[in-house]
């Protein structure tokens, strides 16, 4: 089935939508409604035969990759099926291969519980960690095991519920216990049958939850982006995020227009089917009409597993989809049961994560950007290149000294990597391919935004800064953008475009004016007003967000002030120690530096910030506008965590990460970001990552969420008794 074939999932949406429109108009034009019993028997028989044939050929094409008819022959069958449904609307039912959800589309994404919890996976990052996991497994079960290895797809986890073979519900993973109902959208995907098939060996079970991953194929994602660019629309950043966004569309027709795929990799709750091996469950999934990865392999030793992992590490770009590792599972289900699970992950499975990818590309230019504190940072402009699952075209170069240190020239071929698979970094040039056309980067002497001469803030400082902090539009824009972020006032609708609109219209000069905004001011901007001159929906949301932001805790206000070196951690300490902005402003450097984790550098920065007249004017304006400048202290809270360093990792159900840190600090503790010998406890939620592994290795007490509550309410001695057993 070629990409030009209407039966191909990449192109079928438009074809089906046209058919639906035709069927709707004919049904509406009919004088009387035709019932199924009114359809001639021969037509009903032909329709049933076509449905069966189309399903079978889709199964052979999409699942078995072994079609038995040509693309043209399949197209004829599919078109005939559509024609019969158009001529006889009564024949249409939800199980038809041509099903398109018609009328007014609405997906509310209702929260629904999974029948069986969807756990996350522990990770291994090197061969020694994987060997240690295998040793633990075989020590626990008292014998050797077989290991099923499969590619770790970088997609969106999904849970399908089939009852008597019929798709009843599709949920996103959510928090593992509860997911979002995306059934209408999932029904539009060709890889997800409405009705399971079955064989004598593997009949369809009475009930089964099927877990899998929704993704874009690499080539189809590229085609999708090319079509978007051709249409004058911005391309998607990476396949994983665009797959998630495509599946969560409110209009299922949009989802259907995207070439989403799904590969199944496990079962949840089931009735009427008990496999003996994980690999047997995959054979059953294939028999039921679902896709399973063709790259799954069962191996007997850890050396074989590592060899398999090494192979895919070298060939990860040859898979049809993005991968970020290999999942290793104990194949025997009886051993899986004996191994059990922790509160967050099965003990019988682990994900081996690959290190960040590297790639080479052309360095087209080096430009500079001005930050919120005036720092002028050079960044690389490159030919777009695929690295670690996303397309990279820019990367920071930090400062002019780093450019010289790396030895990169404009026009070079450069090696880049994504540190932590997130932040693009230029490692250095490929010197051997230089042809003499390359040129050195010259750091500008003037601010690119306001023209002010750049200078070092102090002797020995490697960074150049624009000293025009109050009037430089670049700095004002960055400060406003930063204060709206999640770690400051968390003003949802005030993004970069909104900040630029406010500055361009002149309704704010700097951050001091932000909380004086009203409807009259927003109507002066094109972004926050409608074509008829009224306030837009986002304009109304912005005013509501600003009102809510006035009640944010003191530490967020401190972050929003853009005081150099003061991030969320230092801000929390200052807020906890002093309680109000007035007391912070009145404190000496020595008093400020006394807070744990503050020190002289931050204390000096705070003192110098308050010495500037226009900085104090911002505080005055915010205070007069009603921004909360002091925290209410609960004197009843015992400070029984004083002096203790506590690390929180993973997702907690009852607390956000910020809330957990605030509760720790309110009791005198330090919310640390890494595990060390000084760590008193590590609190783990879902997907805790390497911090949990390090805690186990260093024998630091580990608390689950219940243990964390004990720590908060009863103190460290009681929490030590509630710690999870050492693995």
Curated annotation (Swiss-Prot):
GO terms for molecular function: DNA ligase (NAD+) activity; metal ion binding. Residues 636-725 form the BRCT domain. One of its GO terms (biological process) is DNA repair. One of its GO terms (cellular component) is cytosol. This is DNA ligase. DNA ligase that catalyzes the formation of phosphodiester linkages between 5'-phosphoryl and 3'-hydroxyl groups in double-stranded DNA using NAD as a coenzyme and as the energy source for the reaction. It is essential for DNA replication and repair of damaged DNA. The keyword DNA repair applies. NCBIfam families: dnlj (TIGR00575), PRK07956.1 (NF005932). It is an enzyme of class 6 (ligase). It catalyses: NAD(+) + (deoxyribonucleotide)n-3'-hydroxyl + 5'-phospho-(deoxyribonucleotide)m = (deoxyribonucleotide)n+m + AMP + beta-nicotinamide D-nucleotide. Belongs to the NAD-dependent DNA ligase family. LigA subfamily. Its EC number is 6.5.1.2. NAD(+) binds at residues 71-75, 120-121, 150, 173, 213, 329, 353. The active site is at 152 (n6-amp-lysine intermediate). Zn(2+) binds at residues 447, 450, 466, 472. Pfam families: BRCT, DNA_ligase_aden, DNA_ligase_OB, DNA_ligase_ZBD, HHH_2, Nlig-Ia. Keywords: DNA damage, DNA repair, DNA replication, Ligase, Magnesium, Manganese, Metal-binding, NAD, Zinc. Its cofactor is Mg(2+); Mn(2+). Coiled coil: none annotated.
